[in-house]
Amino acid sequence: MNQYPAERIARARVLVVGDVMLDRYWFGEVDRISPEAPVPVVRVARREDRLGGAANVARNVAALGAQVTLIGVVGADEVGHRIERMAAEEGVRTDLVSDTEHPTTLKMRVLGRQQQLLRVDFEQHPEPAALDGISAAVARQLAQHDIVVLSDYAKGVLDRVESIIAAAVGHSLPVLVDPKGDHYERYRGATLVTPNRAEMREAVGRWKTEDELAERAQRLRLDLDLEALLVTRSEQGMTLFTDAGRDHADAAAHEVYDVSGAGDTVLATLAVMRAVGLSWGDAMRWANRAGGIVVGKLGTSVVTAAELAGEST
């Protein structure tokens, strides 16, 4: 694989649109069981916040050295303000829509001895007025970017994804989608869709052989008018389907510690590498390496340009 294209990446402009959320971690020690119920008592010693969902995709793009703008919905609350501050600190430009009726999506995890004990989610779908704001923000930003990434976590921001794809295609911009659910018709006309193994099974059913997977993947790709379809397959690596056929990269992870946000890292790396003109195959291999690095980290994390460049030497 070629040398890390740092200079070209610095000029790349990536627009990320999707479900923005905050991942909040409470770390502590467990030394007893509650007398109120048979559950562990965690003495919280440290709290850490990380950008999640589409915001994690954006921070991964920034960590690789590219320019990035994030569009999403936040509430008029502490969590929303925290996301805006953290995004700025990580080099992510934002064009966020404020929904005063609903809270910002928050995923709170409680960990003891580095093991996750509990996750609590706070979320509601945005109001139609907020979705109007998303459409307006996309219209403002498209002309200033080279590629569009849609990060769908089924929280409602991409309920009008068809119109966003159409607008991007109207500006001759590639559209990369991390999908959710089994209604893939919504993503028709995008450039690439990146389902994981479970999502692919949900969309096309189970397969028994690689040939059967290839047949179903190519049929789905052609039905949706996609240029490429990438199936991420955990320990089996990732498989790319295009007009040229099937291409595969074996898993690159040295040690799997936490898979949270790994798909975000893969999507961000694909977008950056395609924005600078790399082929689908080369972009997939860079993304595979990035995914292999990030699963060795705890929680939603990023892969830096230095880490990825080091892996290529």
UniProtKB/Swiss-Prot annotation:
<comment type="pathway">
    <text>Bacterial outer membrane biogenesis; LPS core biosynthesis.</text>
</comment>
<comment type="pathway">
    <text>Nucleotide-sugar biosynthesis; ADP-L-glycero-beta-D-manno-heptose biosynthesis; ADP-L-glycero-beta-D-manno-heptose from D-glycero-beta-D-manno-heptose 7-phosphate: step 1/4.</text>
</comment>
<protein>
    <recommendedName>
        <fullName>D-beta-D-heptose 7-phosphate kinase</fullName>
        <ecNumber>2.7.1.167</ecNumber>
    </recommendedName>
</protein>
<keyword id="KW-0808">Transferase</keyword>
<keyword id="KW-0448">Lipopolysaccharide biosynthesis</keyword>
<dbReference type="Pfam" id="PF00294">
    <property type="entry name" value="PfkB"/>
</dbReference>
<comment type="similarity">
    <text>Belongs to the carbohydrate kinase PfkB family.</text>
</comment>
<keyword id="KW-0547">Nucleotide-binding</keyword>
<dbReference type="InterPro" id="IPR011611">
    <property type="entry name" value="PfkB_dom"/>
</dbReference>
<dbReference type="InterPro" id="IPR002173">
    <property type="entry name" value="Carboh/pur_kinase_PfkB_CS"/>
</dbReference>
<dbReference type="GO" id="GO:0033785">
    <property type="term" value="F:heptose 7-phosphate kinase activity"/>
</dbReference>
<dbReference type="GO" id="GO:0016773">
    <property type="term" value="F:phosphotransferase activity, alcohol group as acceptor"/>
</dbReference>
<dbReference type="GO" id="GO:0005524">
    <property type="term" value="F:ATP binding"/>
</dbReference>
<feature type="binding site">
    <location>
        <begin position="196"/>
        <end position="199"/>
    </location>
    <ligand>
        <name>ATP</name>
    </ligand>
</feature>
<keyword id="KW-0119">Carbohydrate metabolism</keyword>
<feature type="active site">
    <location>
        <position position="264"/>
    </location>
</feature>
<dbReference type="InterPro" id="IPR029056">
    <property type="entry name" value="Ribokinase-like"/>
</dbReference>
<dbReference type="GO" id="GO:0005829">
    <property type="term" value="C:cytosol"/>
</dbReference>
<dbReference type="GO" id="GO:0033786">
    <property type="term" value="F:heptose-1-phosphate adenylyltransferase activity"/>
</dbReference>
<keyword id="KW-0067">ATP-binding</keyword>
<keyword id="KW-0418">Kinase</keyword>
<dbReference type="GO" id="GO:0009244">
    <property type="term" value="P:lipopolysaccharide core region biosynthetic process"/>
</dbReference>
<dbReference type="GO" id="GO:0097171">
    <property type="term" value="P:ADP-L-glycero-beta-D-manno-heptose biosynthetic process"/>
</dbReference>
<dbReference type="InterPro" id="IPR011913">
    <property type="entry name" value="RfaE_dom_I"/>
</dbReference>
